[in-house]
Amino acid sequence: MASQTAIIGAGVMGETLLSGLVRSGRRVDDLLVGEKRAERVTELEERYGVTVVGNREAAEKADTVALVVKPQDMADVLAEIAPVLRPGQLLVSLAA
């Protein structure tokens, strides 16, 4: 089984990362997106065929977690996912 990658935050930067991964050949089955806005969930599922879940579930299931949120939101996101993070996971911050 390939490693799971989660993208938490699906704004412009998060979607750009997602789009690049899909275009480069990454299987959508190996990608999870954490997004809280209902309209974005539907949009991303229809456009890319990815699984969109809550942030905590995405972080729990993934081997690599890309945090693509605004700096002022980072503390809240980290507090939300901290209980499910485990040794060996790779966290990448793309906060901007």
Where are these regions (language model features)?
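NAD(P)+-binding Rossmann beta1-loop-alpha1 motif at the extreme N-terminus of oxidoreductases
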Residues: M1-R56, E60
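Rossmann-like NAD(P)(H) cofactor-binding subdomain of soluble oxidoreductases
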Residues: A38, R47-Y48, N55-A96
